[in-house]
A protein has these predicted regions:
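Extended amphipathic ligand-handling, pore-lining, and cofactor/metal-binding catalytic surfaces
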Residues: 1-260
Length: 260
């Protein structure tokens, strides 16, 4: 019986970032599951799919196209692994697409996102991820950076911030590109707390343009704003998928779905 694992993200037009994040997970899955499962990747943003094709002649198909092809090629078991930091609108979109094919295969299931929205599980997951990303902190306090949302709750970021603070015993702050946790508000807290040395750790699954343009380089970047306040700043530009420990969490999640 032909079996597949499909990694699904909204998408990124950062080709190098794709290769350094999803590409690493693909290699790990091939090593771990390769004898039984073939690994594919898919995006759900047609705009990003078109940009990648136009700029780099690099094709990442839409999830619906991948599933259509797998059905036609006779695949009977498919595990969908969302590459979203948390369940939400993106996962709902994946579920809508998957439901169109659920009667075309013997087994078509969706594995869980990196974080769930159940409080008990979220606390445990935050400590797992917090331990992984808290490596190599040195003599620095910590600024975590997330994408955030203008419309949804940022409870996830509050829980991660608390977990990293308890793990590292450092001053820990959280800023998001969208939402109320702005860099301006964080800078006020940093100055009030007399923070001198800071390491910036992004919480993105795929390193997109945000890490490069908004946070780390150019006029008006977060790093520039922090340095203007005489704060010594180091940035760790790793995406979450560049941590081996995070990739192992995904392998564990997929294993759990396979065994059900």
């Amino acid at each position: 019986m032909s079996k597949a694992i499909v990694l699904v993200a909204f998408g990124s037009a950062n080709l190098d970032g794709i290769k350094k994040s999803i590409g690493l997970l693909e290699k790990d899955l091939d090593s771990y599951f390769g004898e039984e499962y073939t690994t594919f990747k898919a995006f759900t943003s047609n705009k990003i799919i078109d940009l990648l094709k136009e700029r780099y002649d690099y094709v990442v198909p839409h999830l619906s196209k991948v599933l259509f092809n797998l059905v036609n090629q006779g695949y009977e078991e498919v595990i969908i692994q969302p590459l979203h930091i948390m369940s939400g609108r993106d996962k709902n979109q994946i579920e809508e697409i998957v439901n169109e094919y659920k009667y075309s295969m013997k087994k078509l299931v969706i594995s869980k996102a990196l974080f769930t929205d159940e409080d008990d599980k979220l606390n445990k997951e935050s400590y797992e991820v917090g331990n992984i990303i808290s490596e190599n902190i040195g003599n620095n306090d910590i600024l975590l950076v997330g994408h955030g949302s203008k419309t949804s709750s940022n409870k996830l970021y509050d829980v991660i911030e608390k977990a990293v603070r308890e793990i590292t015993h450092k001053k820990v702050y959280m800023a998001t590109l969208e939402g109320k946790k702005t860099i301006d508000t964080v800078i006020e807290s940093l100055l009030r707390d007399e923070v001198n040395n800071l390491i910036v750790k992004p919480l993105f699954i795929i390193p997109g343009k945000h890490v490069v343009s908004d946070i780390s380089t150019g006029d008006g970047s977060w790093i520039e704003m922090l340095k203007e306040k005489n704060i010594n700043v180091t940035i760790n530009e790793n995406s979450l998928l560049q941590y081996e420990g995070i990739r192992k969490l995904y392998i564990r999640n997929i294993n759990e779905v396979i065994k059900k």
